[in-house]
UniProtKB/Swiss-Prot annotation:
One of its GO terms (biological process) is tetrahydrofolate biosynthetic process. PANTHER family: GTP CYCLOHYDROLASE MPTA (PTHR36445:SF1). It is an enzyme of class 3 (hydrolase). InterPro entries: GTP_cyclohydrolase_FolE2, GTP_cyclohydrolase_FolE2/MptA. Keywords: Hydrolase. Converts GTP to 7,8-dihydroneopterin triphosphate. Gene3D superfamilies: Urate Oxidase (3.10.270.10). The record marks 156 as: May be catalytically important. This is GTP cyclohydrolase FolE2 1.
Length: 309
């Protein structure tokens, strides 16, 4: 007969009687399944899970219980707000002997999406969008937020104006003594000197955080990122041929933007469609060794912060 294994978390008391705000594990690998309109895929995620430990005499929590509950998160139906709440409730219930009343979960993963080329038919590639889900159940109050990051290209409006001026001056100098200008000669000049100067542009990123209600059928991540990319107009591309690169250059020319413009575009596009969208954009400047950044939030959130202050 095998002897019972000791469990010091039950048989020993904490030497210092201090409650702990959170205890748990982080960086747990697991598969998750996302099922949304137009999207169904199993993805690799990393999870952080914690419960509170208010009982000062309890030496430790039961991490194996939390691990087992997390391992059952993928039930084949797809991750949803209600499924996440059920997990948090089960985490609390599994630690009643620790007087636990709160639980939280953080999931990090990449939303992997197949994106077609801009104009060339039959070619496409994969884009990944980093996602972070934060869920908590504190005092029976459930909260869930999603943060997703999307890459795009930004071309500086000021630099574009300076570029146009140089091209204009070069054209005027080249044809200063011409009474009539032949179209063919103008075309030839533009082919050679149209890039006399070029505006600076750079890869940029937008990180958006939204609240997700528990009664929504899914997380709505693909819909969110599609709204972000449509608002900006210049999402970074995957597979391209020359025609697609030309189309991308045209999109950049039609969507000149400062970091302020990008933040405002996204905020306007998301406000009223998603709950409490918070926008952070970053332009990794090619002109400077530093980044340009901007933040935006709904007006009601700004007012609430001012009142709280």
């Amino acid at each position: 007969m095998s002897a019972a294994l000791p469990d010091v978390s039950l048989t020993e008391a904490s030497p210092t009687f201090t409650p702990l705000e959170w205890v748990g594990m982080q960086g747990i690998d697991l598969p998750i399944r996302l099922v949304e309109p137009g999207y169904r895929r199993q993805l690799h995620a990393r999870a952080d899970i914690h419960v509170d430990l208010p009982a000062p005499r309890v030496k430790g929590i039961h991490m194996s219980r939390l691990y087992a509950l997390l391992d059952a998160l993928d039930d084949g139906e797809g991750l949803s707000p209600i499924r996440i709440r059920q997990l948090l409730e089960a985490m609390v219930d599994s630690h009643r002997d620790c007087e636990t009343g709160s639980a939280r979960l953080r999931l990090r993963f990449d939303l992997l999406v197949r994106r077609p080329a801009l104009v060339t038919e039959g070619i496409a590639g994969w884009k990944s969008y980093p996602v972070r889900l934060d869920a908590s159940l504190v005092g029976n109050v459930f909260a869930l937020t999603a943060r997703i990051t999307a890459g795009y290209s930004s071309t500086c409006p000021c630099s574009a104006a300076l570029t146009r001026q140089l091209v204009e001056q070069g054209f005027a100098k080249a044809f200063a003594h011409e009474r009539r200008v032949d179209v063919a000669r103008v075309s030839a000049w533009l082919r050679q000197h149209g890039t006399l100067a070029t505006p600076h542009s750079q890869r940029s990123e937008a990180s958006i955080t939204v609240d997700i209600a528990v009664d929504l059928p899914n997380l709505g991540l693909l819909d969110l990122v599609d709204h972000i990319e449509r608002a900006l107009g210049t999402p970074v591309q995957t597979a391209v041929k020359r025609a697609d690169e030309q189309a991308f250059a045209a999109l950049n020319g039609q969507n000149l933007m400062f970091v302020e413009d990008a933040a405002r575009r996204i905020q306007v596009a998301l406000d009223g469609r998603f709950a409490n969208p918070r926008v952070h954009v970053r332009h990794l400047e090619s002109l400077h060794p530093h980044d340009a950044v901007a933040w935006a939030a709904p007006l009601q959130m700004k007012h609430s912060r001012e009142v709280a202050a």
